[in-house]
């Protein structure tokens, strides 16, 4: 047993040593990019320390991947009572090769980060097709010599250390002469199993619902420190895995240039050669300002809130008395549709005015994309932005994505008491709303306008109805809607007591819908038909019947606020413009609809489904020219969005 424990100590010593060297690379990155630190980070020395702690966390994940096979080999050799020189030679070569790769990536990341301000990712493989040019670039730039030298120095030092450790621990194993009966071999198996289990847990990285993602490293408002904690190797591997996902393959609906030309005409966008083909400057009409003091904005995204749950849209049960009453007191929209059928689609489209791209989660990835949108424009105009979610911050990469794209603070399950967590999606709606009120009071007290986004969750399985709430219906799917509506009422009643209420615009929408009633076609309307209400005590109520979608919320709200900005997205101001139709997606389905026609296109099977809408009911009809405007409208918007994302033209400024 002593020889086995000697072997385990040897392997763990290598693991710790490797993490220390990875930390040295991080220290070099920190020093080389020190000038990127904000004044807040410079004044608070604990922030860099926390970034390094996150770095150890991420480095350990990669280390555990490497450690897993040696642990298995160690257990097998321990059971067989083999501790020969060949075993230690194997470990020396194995760790030298794999950590050599890790250190090569870390060294390469230093100049890469300095140039791109992001960690090395799968895009580097595009350079492999130009091997000569790439080699010339690396060898011809003297600034890269430091990274090359550090790599060679640290790797050489690590290999020498491995050789020393192998000799030392092998010699120790020879000096240990103890019998190794079968019961002790069983003990070795037990210890080894525990260590392997811990190693697998280390690979997962955390105890929460989701394994560790890049988002876990984001903890403050300093963009550099948020990225400092991410392991370059972790970032590279996960970005490669992201690229391999089928849903991330490039979308081909029509010719790119044709799509852009059509989108420019349909949206009346002249484009800006320095920004994007769809960029346009929006100049506010100052005389139409809602009020002298810039209003706060509270956006509430209601989980799975299909319009079909509301009496106003034909629901027979009284499920949403508060929303139905608010609908008549707001600027409300009768024909409003979600961009997709998942929460990430709704957030992405609502906040940044880009359409959902089929199944793809455009927020989720190790390489955090940058977008201009409602949060960034408001931030540029003096707003303080807050995001409140019920679940873990790294779910759908939300923490990292939103901190990168305009939000100052993100509140998530990690901030709430553990006893308030009711399921894998965190806390319930009423707790989220109660938690937000004092936070918003603190922000309002500063005199700075705020933009707060609250993402509810209760209307998502598994449904958890609080014991204190007594619904009137009998089915859980309906009871939870009653509860969600009740929680909203409680939030508004509490918010109405606050001094900031009258100077706040409230925007309420479903993040997407769900199946309500029977399916009338391949894609039931209830999945995407959602309510949108814009409420303020100083806004005249009105119902809009023109078509609109989540991509339109940003320009509509900025129009209400009378803010000048450069628009580079797919939204229209629904208070000043009208769409002839609306487009949206649902996983593999592209949809275009107007008052009389419905066009569905299955991207995977390339099947077209066409319906006539007569008296609110669908009648299947053959495809003909009358559906072409819907097809061209939908395809051109989606293909143009794919072009802008592919080429990084998602900001409202010159890159």
What are these regions (language model features)?
Residues 2-249:
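Transmembrane and membrane-interface helices of multi-pass
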Residues 21, 121, 131-132, 230-234, ...:
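Alpha-helix initiation and N-capping motif
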Residues 30, 86, 111-113, 165, ...:
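Charged, low-complexity, helix-prone segments enriched in Lys/Glu/Asp/Gln
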Residues 55, 59, 137, 164, ...:
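Residues that form generic nucleotide/phosphate-binding pockets
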Residues 85-86, 247-258, 363-367, 571-572:
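Short alpha-helical "patches" and their helix-cap loops
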Residues 125, 129-130, 231, 245-246, ...:
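Short coil/turn linker and secondary-structure boundary residues
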Residues 130, 218, 222, 229-234, ...:
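The feature marks either
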Residues 268-655:
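Solvent-exposed soluble domains appended to multi-pass membrane proteins
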């Amino acid at each position: 047993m002593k020889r086995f424990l000697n072997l385990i100590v040897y392997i763990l010593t290598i693991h710790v040593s490797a993490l220390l060297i990875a930390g040295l690379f991080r220290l070099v990155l920190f020093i080389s990019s020190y000038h990127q630190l904000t004044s807040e980070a410079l004044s608070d020395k604990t922030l860099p320390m926390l970034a390094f702690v996150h770095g150890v966390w991420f480095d350990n994940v990669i280390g555990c991947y490497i450690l897993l096979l040696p642990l298995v080999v160690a257990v097998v050799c321990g059971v067989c009572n083999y501790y020969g020189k060949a075993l230690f030679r194997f470990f020396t070569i194995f760790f030298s090769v794999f950590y050599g790769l890790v250190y090569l990536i870390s060294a390469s990341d230093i100049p890469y980060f300095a140039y791109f301000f992001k960690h090395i990712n799968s895009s580097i493989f595009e350079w492999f097709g130009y091997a000569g040019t790439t080699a010339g670039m690396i060898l011809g730039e003297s600034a890269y010599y430091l990274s090359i030298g550090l790599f060679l120095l640290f790797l050489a030092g690590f290999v020498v250390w491995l050789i020393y450790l192998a000799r030392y621990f092998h010699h120790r194993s020879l000096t240990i002469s103890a019998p190794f009966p079968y019961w002790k071999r069983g003990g070795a198996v037990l210890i080894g199993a525990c260590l392997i289990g811990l190693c697998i847990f280390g690979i997962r990285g955390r105890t929460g619902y989701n394994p560790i993602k890049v988002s876990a490293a984001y903890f403050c408002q300093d963009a550099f420190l948020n990225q400092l904690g991410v392991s370059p190797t972790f970032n590279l591997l996960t970005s490669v895995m992201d690229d391999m996902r089928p849903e991330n393959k490039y979308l081909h609906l029509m010719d790119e240039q044709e799509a852009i030309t059509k989108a420019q005409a349909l949206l009346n966008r002249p484009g800006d050669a320095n920004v994007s083909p769809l960029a346009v400057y929006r100049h506010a009409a100052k005389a139409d300002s809602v009020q002298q003091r810039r209003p706060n904005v509270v956006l509430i995204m209601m989980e799975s809130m299909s319009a079909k749950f509301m009496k106003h849209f034909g629901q027979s049960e009284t499920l949403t008395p508060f929303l139905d009453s608010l609908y008549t007191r707001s600027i409300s929209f009768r024909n409003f549709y979600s961009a997709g059928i998942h929460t990430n689609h709704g957030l992405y489209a609502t906040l940044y005015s880009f359409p959902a791209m089929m199944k793809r989660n455009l927020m989720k990835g190790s390489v955090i994309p940058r977008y201009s949108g409602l949060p960034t424009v408001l931030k540029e105009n003096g707003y303080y932005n807050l995001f409140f979610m019920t679940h873990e911050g790294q779910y759908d990469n939300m923490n990292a994505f939103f901190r990168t794209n305009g939000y100052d603070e993100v509140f998530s399950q990690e901030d709430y008491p553990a006893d308030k967590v009711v399921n894998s999606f965190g806390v319930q709606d009423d707790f989220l709303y109660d938690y937000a009120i004092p936070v918003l009071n603190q922000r309002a007290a500063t005199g700075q306008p705020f933009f707060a986004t609250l993402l509810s969750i209760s209307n998502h399985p598994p449904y958890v109805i609080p014991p204190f709430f007594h619904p009137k219906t009998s089915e859980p799917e309906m009871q939870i809607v009653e509860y969600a509506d009740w929680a909203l009422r409680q939030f508004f009643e509490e918010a109405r007591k606050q001094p900031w209420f009258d100077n706040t615009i409230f925007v309420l929408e479903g993040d997407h819908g769900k199946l309500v009633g029977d399916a009338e076609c391949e894609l039931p309307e209830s999945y995407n038909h959602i309510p949108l209400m814009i409420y303020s005590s100083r806004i005249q109520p009105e119902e809009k019947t023109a078509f609109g979608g989540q991509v339109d919320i940003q320009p509509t709200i900025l129009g209400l606020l009378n803010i000048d900005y450069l628009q580079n997205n797919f939204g229209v101001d629904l208070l000043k413009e009208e769409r002839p139709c609306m487009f949206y997606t649902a996983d593999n389905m592209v949809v275009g609809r107007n008052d009389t026609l419905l066009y569905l296109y299955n991207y995977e099977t390339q099947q077209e489904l066409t319906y006539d809408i007569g008296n609110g009911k669908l009648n299947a009809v053959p495809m003909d020219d009358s559906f072409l405007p819907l097809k061209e409208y939908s395809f051109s918007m989606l293909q143009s969005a794919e072009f802008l994302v592919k080429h990084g033209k998602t900001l409202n400024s010159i890159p």
